[in-house]
């Protein structure tokens, strides 16, 4: 028998403010020791391709939880962001840590057919790999120190530092691009929801979700050139005024009786 484990709320942050995705209920088909439900809080980290995740992320005996939500905003968000079968949403939990490393715990939310599921990232194997790599580096370092000249060691250290700098630069660039795209999505979502409210369109109306999605997709298409430049790292953020004008034009068109 399925049992509700907890309720998850997570934040999408941006320069224009924060949007909270609320009331995501996690249910399990497996028996658990705890009988009380709790509330988890989290922060959106990024979108991932599930097919490209390392094998250690998900163990074979890991629990997969079913996700439900009565929130129209949450339903619209997941419908928009999980259209691709292999896409996942990474959430860092604010009040839960990995028991072994005491590092933040992470959930990945994904869609399987028509069902919304999630699982917690398993860091156990990663820590084992990290430990083995650290030990191997120490052993190699001792061997090289005994047979190498001081100058060659300096070169190795310098090359290692240069590789680290190059990796960090690439990561910072990707994070900057993701931040711009996330800011666009957050601002667009808020403008659409606000425009629907101003027009007295309640989320209880049958075509509410369809109208939201059609407006969202049309706005993305309208600004496709700017979004393409952003994805290449050469574009500026789409201005709030430009996006607001697009949404108003689309809503006038789609809600015209």
UniProtKB/Swiss-Prot annotation:
Q: Which Pfam families match?
A: Sld7_C, Sld7_N
Q: Which UniProt keywords apply?
A: Cell cycle, Cytoplasm, Cytoskeleton, DNA replication, Nucleus
Listed GO CC annotations = cytoplasm; nucleus; spindle pole
One GO BP annotation of this record: regulation of DNA-templated DNA replication initiation
Bilayer-crossing residues are: none
Name the InterPro entries for this protein. Answer: Sld7, Sld7_C, Sld7_N
Compartments, record wording: Nucleus; Cytoplasm, Cytoskeleton, Spindle pole
Query: What family name appears in the similarity comment?
Result: Belongs to the SLD7 family.
Subunit relationships: Interacts with SLD3.
Cited function: Required for the proper function of SLD3 at the initiation of DNA replication. Binds to SLD3 and reduces its affinity for CDC45, a component of the replication fork. Required for mitochondrial morphology.
Name of the protein = Mitochondrial morphogenesis protein SLD7
Organism this protein belongs to: Saccharomyces cerevisiae (strain RM11-1a)
